[in-house]
Structure formats: C-alpha cells, structure tokens
From Swiss-Prot:
Keywords: Cytoplasm, Hydrolase, Protease, Serine protease. It comes from Lysinibacillus sphaericus (strain C3-41). It comes from the Bacteria. One of its GO terms (biological process) is protein quality control for misfolded or incompletely synthesized proteins. This is ATP-dependent Clp protease proteolytic subunit. It is found in: Cytoplasm. Its EC number is 3.4.21.92. It catalyses: Hydrolysis of proteins to small peptides in the presence of ATP and magnesium. alpha-casein is the usual test substrate. In the absence of ATP, only oligopeptides shorter than five residues are hydrolyzed (such as succinyl-Leu-Tyr-|-NHMec, and Leu-Tyr-Leu-|-Tyr-Trp, in which cleavage of the -Tyr-|-Leu- and -Tyr-|-Trp bonds also occurs). Fourteen ClpP subunits assemble into 2 heptameric rings which stack back to back to give a disk-like structure with a central cavity, resembling the structure of eukaryotic proteasomes. NCBIfam families: clpP, PRK00277.1, PRK12553.1. GO terms for molecular function: ATP-dependent peptidase activity; ATPase binding; serine-type endopeptidase activity. The lineage of its organism: Bacteria, Bacillati, Bacillota, Bacilli, Bacillales.
Length: 197
C-alpha cells in the first residue's frame, strides 16, 4: 500500500490540507519517483504544462528517483521539457537509470544536479519481440532506430562523441555522481539546498 503524506498549512482563512505532491507542486517541484509508464508520463506532462500556465518565466524542478521504463512515455516527458518556456532543473536523488538518466540529462544545461550519493545508469534500449519472423524483424529495426535516436540526444546533452555514447551504453553503465558530472550527464553535485537557487 502506498501511503501519501498530508501536510497542513495555516492560512488567513484557516487550515488547508494538501497531499505532499500537491504541496510540492505549489513550489514548482515535480517528483518522478517510480518506473516510467504512460500514466506516470501523463501525470508529469500535465504538471509541466500546468506550471507553465501558472508562470512561464519561473523555473521548474524535476526530482528523479527512477529505474527508467517505457521509451515512448519517457520521450513524451522529454519533448514536453524541451517545448515549454520554463527552464526545467533536474535533480537525481537515489538512482536515475535508463530513461530516468536520459531525463536527468535533458534538464536545462547548467541546472542538472545529483545528490552526493546518487547513482546514474545508462544503457541501450531494451525490447522483446515474439511472433512471426517479420514481426521480430520490425521490432528489432525499431529498437535499433530508438538506440540511434537516444544516443544522438545523449551525445548532444553530454558533449560526448556519438561513438563514446554507443560504446558506453552497450551494457549497463553505472556511475557515481562524480562520474556522471565528468561524463556530462549532470552539471553539479548538490551539497546544500541553496545550491539549486
């Protein structure tokens, strides 16, 4: 069972109760704390669009603790991050793996962070296929296409040559926060909350 904490604020009109995620959203903070599927992506995209409508000139913070997930769902979040006007600061807490790492790198350059003990993992897209030979061939071509697309974007976001990205994503590649910074997936290691201002 997933218990969602409630916070209570005192206002001039009395008390107001929020679930913790709504309270964080009020401060322009979004938490991606699960595997990425269509439902999670729809929720994150809706929050990004809402915050843009609220104030298109104020930054948004996206905290990431995710094992990754669906490529298409992750790309929905990525594309939205790129088209909205507010800058999206990304912060890795715990682990940003696979599509989680991709979204971490997709943050506004100069505003991509990891906590000191966070880990980042990159790898090539995963996929399975079954059925007739032609269906398996179609699925394999799609995975290869997605790998090229994701590697190209990671190369742009990190400054690493495409060949290096292709080599380093061939297998699970785990990185400390320090290594992720050297690699270009993040810009800073956050030591105090004032670092993200």
């Amino acid at each position: 069972m997933n218990l969602i904490p409630t916070v209570i604020e005192q206002t001039s009109r009395g008390e107001r109760a929020y679930d913790i995620y709504s309270r964080l959203l009020k401060d322009r903070i979004i938490l991606l704390g699960s595997a990425i599927d269509d439902n999670v992506a729809n929720s994150i995209v809706a929050q990004l669009l809402f915050l843009q409508a609220e104030d298109p000139d104020k930054d948004i913070s996206l905290y990431i603790n995710s094992p990754g997930g669906s490529i298409t769902a992750g790309m929905a979040i990525y594309d939205t991050m790129q088209i909205i006007k507010p800058k999206v600061q990304t912060i890795c807490i715990g682990m940003a793996a696979s599509m989680g790492a991709f979204l971490l790198a997709a943050g506004e350059p100069g505003k991509r962070f990891a906590l000191p003990n966070a880990e980042v993992m990159i790898h090539q897209p995963l996929g399975g296929a079954q059925g007739q030979a032609t269906e398996i061939e179609i699925a394999a071509k799609r995975i290869l296409f997605l790998r090229e697309k994701l590697n190209g974007i990671l190369s742009e976001r990190t400054g690493q040559p495409l060949e290096v990205i292709a080599r380093d994503t061939d297998r699970d590649n785990f990185m400390t926060a320090e290594r992720a910074k050297e690699y270009g997936l993040i810009d800073h290691i956050m030591h105090r909350s004032t670092d993200n201002k």
